[in-house]
Amino acid sequence: CANKGEGLQRWLQEQAILAALTLPRLEGESEEDWLSRVVSDSKETAKSAAERGTQIHGVIEAFYEGVYIPELPTYVRAVETAINEHFGSQLWVSEKSFARGGYGGKCDLIAKNCVIDFKTTEKDLDKLDYYFDHQMQLAAYRQGFEMPTARCAIVYVNALQNKAKLVEIPEDDLRIGWDCFTHLLAFYRAKNKL
């Protein structure tokens, strides 16, 4: 289990460095203007990645809702295979939400005693594991859905390679995630006088 915040920060830094390497300073351009262009370019890369992720999530959601998709992307079948091989055939419900206990959430995919969240990436799936934030997120979801013993997993989707990888979070890590989440929720409530 890694720290998601560190991974995201590293990715953002890498995007800024790549932008700096691929955007030469224009003749007569001040350093301030060049840096502004570099930052703008790296933000655009992050925005595009987020939009791709939203689009991929939407296609997977539509598939699990039974919407006819004339040209089903190959990565959707990779997701279906990964889930079915791990959890077996289930009646899945997508984008289910809850609000109770002072917090709420929306789960990408839920079945009887299973909670799944999709994460899109362009990285090599063999090198990916779940992050600590995922432990807390899914532990909070299963409690919010009143399924305290639900199995929880992250499904990484690489649409460029048409691959998916399911990583189930061990029960011990989910218990730790729930403990940490409840402490953070109590802190938030106290800080905000709720």
Residue ranges and their predicted role:
Residues C1-G104:
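Metal-dependent nuclease catalytic cores that hydrolyze phosphodiester bonds in DNA/RNA
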Residues W92-N192:
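Mg2+/Mn2+-dependent nuclease catalytic core
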